[in-house]
Amino acid sequence: MTRSSGLGLGIAMIWFSALVLIPLMAVVVTAIDGGWDVFWSTVTNGQTAAAIKLTVFTALGVTVVNVFMGTLIAWVLVRDRFWGKSVLEVMIDIPFALPTIVAGLVLLSLYGNDSPVGIDIANQRPAVFLAFLFVTLPFVVRMVQPVLEELDRDVEEAAASLGASRFTTFRRIVLPSLAPAITAGAALSFARGVSEYGSLVLLSGNLPFKTEVTSVRILSSIENDNVPAAAAVATVLLVISLAVIVLLNVIQRRVAARG
């Protein structure tokens, strides 16, 4: 390692530590500062456990949907030509551009009490799923799309000329190349989902044991001046998110190896 590269690494690590590692460590320390009994009683509290369960399982479900639909949308954008393609390219990024509270208002206007399409899911669990789905849609699409654009289609054509079916070509050639991008998009989708708050405020109603998610539960603890409880819930989410990311990486490596 040269002196200049060592300096760059040092600056990068200091910056990363200041922005990410130290704040995360502070949250964990705050969570266990009151003792393990307090930590355990907080995260196993009925209302808190229900919020964690709803958040994690909804985020997992949304991630699965995004993996399939996001990859499909990316495929259509790259491989197909159709009228309105440029408009779709722009609209995919709308969830990125909209403030989450505005996203909540958009969804409430369409799926609330006065729904113009006759679908009212406000203050129900499907509202949580829909809100998560809306704000996480672009992640897999935007991770997979550039990889698809760079794939050598001659290899796919060669496989087809040798008698490989479209499914076999996709499974053995395309999917292993897309696996890292799909994994990254899935990880971002899950992380974005478990942290969502703004779009849920108007749409889900934040009803305990029904539609309350962990971000709302954390905010409630802070408003009640119970920072250790908020930190405890945040720590549980952190551990779960890290576990999911590790699992996704394992799956990605196995898919790539089989390809």
PLM feature spans:
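Transmembrane-helix boundary motif in ABC transporter permease subunits
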Residues: 1-2, 37-39, 61-92, 105-112, ...
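Transmembrane alpha-helices
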Residues: 10-15, 64, 94, 98, ...
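Periplasmic/extracellular loop-to-transmembrane helix junction in inner-membrane transport proteins
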Residues: 2, 6, 27-64, 76-80, ...
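Amphipathic cytosolic juxtamembrane alpha-helices at the membrane-cytosol interface
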Residues: 57, 83-89, 125-127, 151-184
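Interhelical loop and adjacent transmembrane-helix boundary motif
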Residues: 46, 201-246
